[in-house]
Amino acid sequence: MGVANIIYALFLLGPSIFLKATAQTHPIVIKGNAFFDSKTNERFYIRGVDYQPGGSSSLVDPLASRSCKKDVEIFKKLGINTVRVYQVDNSADHDKCMNALSEAGIYVILDLNTYRHSISRAHPALSYNKVYLQHLFATIDAFKGYDNVLGFFSGNEVVNDEDTTAITWVKAVTRDVKAYIKKHSDRHIPVGYSAADVAENRLQLAHYFNCGDESERADFYAFNMYEWCGYSSMTVSGYYDRIKEFSNYSIPLFLSEFGCNTVEINDDTTPNRPFTEIEAIYSHDMTPVFSGGLVYEYSAEPNHYGLVVIDKDDERRVSRNFITLMKQYAKTPNPKGDGGYKKAGSPSKCPANSTQFNAWEKLPEMPEGAKIYMEKGAGEPLGIEGPTNMWSPFHDGDDDESTSRRPKPKNKPSNVTSTTSYTSGMTSSSESGSSKIGVAFCQALFITVLIATLSF
């Protein structure tokens, strides 16, 4: 019997010998720096995977796909309680999939952005417009009725190096999204940010999202962190350092992506990922500060992180790494009691600007054209292929049509720092100095001409 057949035979033994997901979902609420089940009052730990077949820039909405129920059965085998979805079509019907997930005890953390709707790293002020906010608000409307929506991400890795300029507008988006939920949803749905693990500004960025007025602060914060590789340890991986750094952080923290793949390679050319960090993540050392995490990623893509192979006939085949992760989840219980969470804490102090961190404490006001959506609702959802907010030198994204090009999808890197995003703009955030000067000059010239034209 081949290795693949042995793996599949073990898989078919079913969840009876492994940890089962609870077969119901109640809204998740936040108390102090932790998540709790609103009905049972038990602490909730995220045990999940990142779920976007085709990659994070795929046009396929997995929550509207006919294949969702197949995947839910596999999630149940894996023993998870949460999936993260990077992109959805807000005009599609998600009832069947969301209900199937709920019946399996599985929650969804949803990124509100798409490859056509996000804050541009290069032109954040221009991409923050009515087209963009209408899309985000319409996505909230499409999902606010599902009790198993754990939360929304207002951004993913918009900052992935030392240039943090765009983060001011992401925090403004966080404020706007929270305000929209408060006005138009029957329940509070938490809103947070998923950060790249950039050592130079890791702390400043986290504190920035947790400082200022409550209406502007994130409800939770997450890292895409790949520091633990293979058979590592709390010390070698830096996990102990992260615990110390965030010991006084007052909102829930979790790993929105984890699972290094720079490890020993199997004979089938796939990485041998032992997932030994699972025991650490759900240990008494971690749970006073962190509330679990999501393994990157469900489906096999060219980047070699996938747990499940989806063939051309849409059939699923689990990998050795899937079986390994399933066993690690099964043998690692959550800590008893409340896991040492902090019942009350103080918001962070807004970090000072420096050569490695630059953001405004005073946030920009919501665009005038978007205020009608805040007041009266987003209106008709326009879907992934609807108008884009992306800006080019001849289009500011604030009209009903866009000339913006689709950015090329990015795969996960093979190093320990994640850089997944929807490119967040038409130009790279790592432009050369001369390129930045040229862009700045063109912007200034364009705005001058625009103002002159409007004045005329």
From Swiss-Prot:
Entry-listed glycosylation sites: N248, N353, N415
Q: Which residues bind (1,3-beta-D-glucosyl)n 2?
A: E157, D197, R202
Q: Name one GO molecular function term.
A: 1,3-beta-glucanosyltransferase activity
Q: Does the keyword rRNA-binding apply?
A: no
What is its EC class?
Answer: transferase
Q: Which Pfam families match?
A: Glyco_hydro_72
Q: What induces it?
A: Strongly induced during sporulation.
Lipid attachment points, GPI-anchor amidated serine kind?
S432
| Key word Glycoprotein present | yes
Q: Which residues pair up as cystines?
A: C68-C97, C211-C350, C229-C260
User: What does UniProt list as catalytic?
Assistant: E157, E257
Residues in the signal sequence: 1-25
Any Gene Ontology biological process: cell wall organization
Superkingdom classification of source: Eukaryota
* Gene Ontology cellular component annotations, sorted alphabetically: plasma membrane; prospore membrane; side of membrane
**Propeptide ranges, please?**
433-456
Where does this protein hold (1,3-beta-D-glucosyl)n 1?
A: Y86, N156, Y296
Q: What PANTHER family does the annotation carry?
A: 1,3-BETA-GLUCANOSYLTRANSFERASE GAS1 (PTHR31468), 1,3-BETA-GLUCANOSYLTRANSFERASE GAS5 (PTHR31468:SF5)
Which family does this protein fall into? Belongs to the glycosyl hydrolase 72 family.
Task: Sum up the protein's function in the record's words.
Answer: Splits internally a 1,3-beta-glucan molecule and transfers the newly generated reducing end (the donor) to the non-reducing end of another 1,3-beta-glucan molecule (the acceptor) forming a 1,3-beta linkage, resulting in the elongation of 1,3-beta-glucan chains in the cell wall. Involved in spore wall assembly.
Protein name in UniProt:
1,3-beta-glucanosyltransferase gas4
Q: Which organism is it from?
A: Schizosaccharomyces pombe (strain 972 / ATCC 24843)
